[in-house]
Amino acid sequence: PVLVWRNATRIRLIAAFRAAHDAPETALLTGEPLICDGIELPVKHRKKRIDLEARGLIKGAQCIYLGPGKKPGFSRLFVMGAADPLVNAASIIQIELPDSEEPMIVSAAKMGAAFLHGAAVTTHKAQGSQWPSVQVFGPDLQIAAKMGRVEAGIPLWKRLAYVAITRAEERLYWVTRYALARPKEPLGVGDLDMTPAKLELTAEDPEA
């Protein structure tokens, strides 16, 4: 993803990413990245919440959209890093649009896992997450530096830069200007391991 400071920048970059891949306005393409924004379930559905969280759908989880589910409002997802990554879940997926107060609702389950688009993420939302490769949007940090804001005795731009840099596990790209190269290949899921997890039966401990 591209890590940014300002939400307006995030929305613009997501729109540019989708336009570069010729994504339709009202639907997601297979392979589009998503970030789980939490589970929206009433208290009485506590067991379902625990089940979704056990499958890896926790706030900040990185997912890949595989397509619509069999039921209305459901989506098939690949949860990155999960032991059993193939999940079919009731989902609320919204994509904010430039110059629009109302987001586009791609999947509108009444309740379930909520998602935001994962092509660009604010440094605030990115805290606690890590990716093999991360892009940092330099112009946003430059604006933060010019504002001269200080938080807890540390210049804001330094705090933002630290969070952004430490999100990268292997590689960091520093973006210096508003430009987006055309993708060399279409979005896809060919690099994901789609093998379903093996079912394992374990005997109960009689002394437990």
Enumerate the predicted regions with their spans.
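C-terminal accessory regions
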Residues: 76-207
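Conserved helicase/translocase motor-coupling segment
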Residues: 1-76, 125
